[in-house]
Amino acid sequence: MMFKQYLQVTKPGIIFGNLISVIGGFLLASKGSIDYPLFIYTLVGVSLVVASGCVFNNFIDRDIDRKMERTKNRVLVKGLISPGVSLVYATLLGIAGFMLLWFGANPLACWLGVMGFVVYVGIYSLYMKRHSVYGTLIGSLSGAAPPVIGYCAVTGDFDSGAAILLAIFSLWQMPHSYAIAIFRLKDYQAANIPVLPVVKGISVAKNHITLYIIAFAVATLMLTLGGYAGYKYLVVAAAVSVWWLGMALRGYKVEDDKVWARKLFGFSIIAITALSIMMSVDFMVPNSQSLLTYVW
């Protein structure tokens, strides 16, 4: 029973979703030549770092989680794990994850993990989520870290391919998160969390969703235009982007925003999974200039 509680507090669904993107970035960079020990070290390392961040987030959010229907039964809210124990647990997970990335992958992968962790726990969870409508934007950077870590674990440098991945996954986070905020609007209002639909209204949020999906569509094309992914990837990227944009535009005519937002959220998961799969299997050898090389 205790194992289940310690697993739940790490948010395994979030870990699994991040692993899909890590695999996408790793295999894109590997280009068919897979270093399996490196692959395992990277997956486990990122999983532990994400788990650590989620436990810290649960610790920080336990007061507002009590006010939200979706989160009122979380482990820390119900007192099934003490706050002190959760902090020790989160710290140990983080140390293990960062050590695996440093020694099993490379220092750059580790530092990217540290940056993503600091943004999520230190900037987003501790401050921005509760105080700023821009919290979602800042949080999107940490959400985009895993595929970049996977990519840089292979390459050892931050090149234009890594930058494109950062853009794709950051831009994807925005409509994905705003959709959640719309169909969970009452929860966010009850907890006084200043997400865009609460502060500016659902109509403004719909405009932002549409614009971010357009930007996401452009970013996805850059992997092919930059010589990193092939035309099969391009076709899938274009198809999911057009469909997702169409769903967003239909939101201006719907009567039930909650139902629409839930569908938009559901398709966002399909879209990013499809892209992660396609970049894993339809890769190309790029001609690129390194933006940041870590020599060790």
Swiss-Prot record:
Major site of localization recorded for this protein: membrane
Xref: Pfam families: UbiA
Gene3D superfamilies per record: UbiA prenyltransferase
EC number: 2.5.1.141
Cytoplasmic side: 1-9, 57-78, 127-197, 248-268
InterPro entries, alphabetized: Protohaem_IX_farnesylTrfase, UbiA_prenyltransferase, UbiA_prenylTrfase_CS, UbiA_sf
Broadest EC class assigned to this enzyme: transferase
Residue ranges, Periplasmic side: 29-37, 98-107, 217-228, 288-296
A GO BP entry: heme O biosynthetic process
GO cellular component, one term: plasma membrane
Cellular localization per UniProt: Cell inner membrane
Pathway the protein contributes to: Porphyrin-containing compound metabolism; heme O biosynthesis; heme O from protoheme: step 1/1
Reactions catalysed, as given in the entry: heme b + (2E,6E)-farnesyl diphosphate + H2O = Fe(II)-heme o + diphosphate
Membrane topology: Multi-pass membrane protein
Record's keyword annotation contains Mitochondrion: no
Keyword annotations: Cell inner membrane, Cell membrane, Heme biosynthesis, Membrane, Transferase, Transmembrane, Transmembrane helix
Keyword Membrane among record annotations: yes
Domain of life: Bacteria
GO molecular function: protoheme IX farnesyltransferase activity
Membrane-traversing stretches: 10-28, 38-56, 79-97, 108-126, 198-216, 229-247, 269-287
Family designation: Belongs to the UbiA prenyltransferase family. Protoheme IX farnesyltransferase subfamily.
Annotated PANTHER family: PROTOHEME IX FARNESYLTRANSFERASE, MITOCHONDRIAL
Further remarks about this protein from its record: Carbon 2 of the heme B porphyrin ring is defined according to the Fischer nomenclature.
Entry function: Converts heme B (protoheme IX) to heme O by substitution of the vinyl group on carbon 2 of heme B porphyrin ring with a hydroxyethyl farnesyl side group.
Name this protein carries in UniProt: Protoheme IX farnesyltransferase
Originating species: Salmonella arizonae (strain ATCC BAA-731 / CDC346-86 / RSK2980)
Organism lineage: Bacteria, Pseudomonadati, Pseudomonadota, Gammaproteobacteria, Enterobacterales
